[in-house]
Each structure stands twice: as C-alpha cells, then as structure tokens.
Amino acid sequence: MKLRPLADRVIVKRVDSETKTASGIVIPDAAAEKPDQGEVLAVGPGKRTEKGDLTALTVKVGDRVLFGKYSGQTVKVDGDELLVMKEDDLFAVVEK
C-alpha cells in the first residue's frame, strides 16, 4: 500500500534514537522514549488560502524533522509504523 498525503499533511517515519548514552550506558527498549525525530517520506500539495490559492509546504521529501512525541496519527504500512501529520505539527527541520 502506498499513501499520498492530502492538503498540508506530511508522512513521516520515526528515526530510532540512540540506544546508548554518551557515557556508554545501554538503554533497554522498554525504557526508551518514542523518538521525536523523523524523515519526511511524502508531502501533500499544500494548503489553500482563503482566496483559493495553493501555498506549497516548506518541508520536502528526505528532510529530517522534529515533532512532538504524541504528534500525528500512527498508521502501519507494509509493516512500517508511519505518522501522518499536518506541517504545523512539525517544530523544525534538522540541518545537516
């Protein structure tokens, strides 16, 4: 199955967080928090203004983004857990 986001929605795949701290302590899966970073897999066409004009999204496929731990709607596609969320739910793009 393939998803195509509508309007100002984006599809994000969570990026796993580090399982070891800087001091070398291993964090078990049960204690690890949900990652709050992800990679944008797909973007919608944009948001309509009151005049009907289409405003393109500022994020693009491949961007690494920050979002709230409980943001978006979780969906499973081909065994992968993905998030569908509005661009407004994203906090920032991580620059490389």
Curated annotation (Swiss-Prot):
UniProt key word S-adenosyl-L-methionine: no
Gene Ontology cellular component terms for the protein in this record: cytoplasm
Entry-linked SMART domains: Cpn10 (SM00883)
Molecular function (Gene Ontology), one example: protein-folding chaperone binding
Entry-linked HAMAP family: CH10
Function in brief: Together with the chaperonin GroEL, plays an essential role in assisting protein folding. The GroEL-GroES system forms a nano-cage that allows encapsulation of the non-native substrate proteins and provides a physical environment optimized to promote and accelerate protein folding. GroES binds to the apical surface of the GroEL ring, thereby capping the opening of the GroEL channel.
Record PANTHER family: 10 KDA HEAT SHOCK PROTEIN (PTHR10772), CO-CHAPERONIN GROES (PTHR10772:SF58)
Protein name stated in the entry: Co-chaperonin GroES
Gene this protein is translated from: groES
